[in-house]
C-alpha cells in the first residue's frame, strides 16, 4: 500500500501491518489536512480532530 505524505506529490510505501492510509484535519479547518500517512487502525474523531481513512494506493 502506498500512502501520500503531507504534500501529496510525495508518498511512501507502508510497512507490514499498516494497511490504511489516513489524513487528519483540525475541526476548525476541514479544508487543509495537517497530517497524512500510514496507520493500522483508523482513529476515532474527536472535538478537535477529524480522521479520514482508506485502503487503496494514494487515496489520502
Curated annotation (Swiss-Prot):
Highest taxon, organism lineage: Eukaryota
Cystine bridges: 3-21, 14-38, 42-53, 54-59
Subcellular location, record wording: Secreted; Target cell membrane
Coiled coil: none
Tissues with expression: Expressed by the venom gland.
Keywords: Cardiotoxin, Cytolysis, Disulfide bond, Membrane, Secreted, Target cell membrane, Target membrane, Toxin
Molecular function in Gene Ontology: toxin activity
InterPro entries, per database record: Cytotoxin_Cobra (IPR003572), Snake_3FTx (IPR003571), Snake_toxin-like_sf (IPR045860), Snake_toxin_con_site (IPR018354), Toxin_cobra-type (IPR054131)
One GO biological process term: killing of cells of another organism
One Gene Ontology term, aspect cellular component: other organism cell membrane
Ranges annotated as spanning the membrane: none
Cell inner membrane listed as a keyword: no
Pfam families named in the record: Toxin_cobra-type
Keyword Secreted annotated: yes
Stated role: This three-finger cytotoxin is a basic protein that interacts and penetrates into the cell membrane, with the tips of all the three loops. Cytotoxins which have a 'Pro-30' (P-type) interacts with membrane stronger that those which have a Ser-28 (S-type). CTI interacts with membrane weaker than CTII.
Record's subunit section: Monomer in solution; Homodimer and oligomer in the presence of negatively charged lipids forming a pore with a size ranging between 20 and 30 Angstroms.
Family: Belongs to the three-finger toxin family. Short-chain subfamily. Type IA cytotoxin sub-subfamily.
Name the UniProt record assigns to this protein: Cytotoxin 1
Organism: Naja oxiana
Amino acid at each position: 500500500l502506498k500512502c501520500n505524505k503531507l504534500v501529496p506529490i510525495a508518498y511512501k510505501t507502508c510497512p507490514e501491518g499498516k494497511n490504511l492510509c489516513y489524513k487528519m484535519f483540525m475541526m476548525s479547518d476541514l479544508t487543509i489536512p495537517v497530517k497524512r500517512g500510514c496507520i493500522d487502525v483508523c482513529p476515532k474523531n474527536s472535538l478537535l480532530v477529524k480522521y479520514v481513512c482508506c485502503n487503496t494506493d494514494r487515496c489520502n
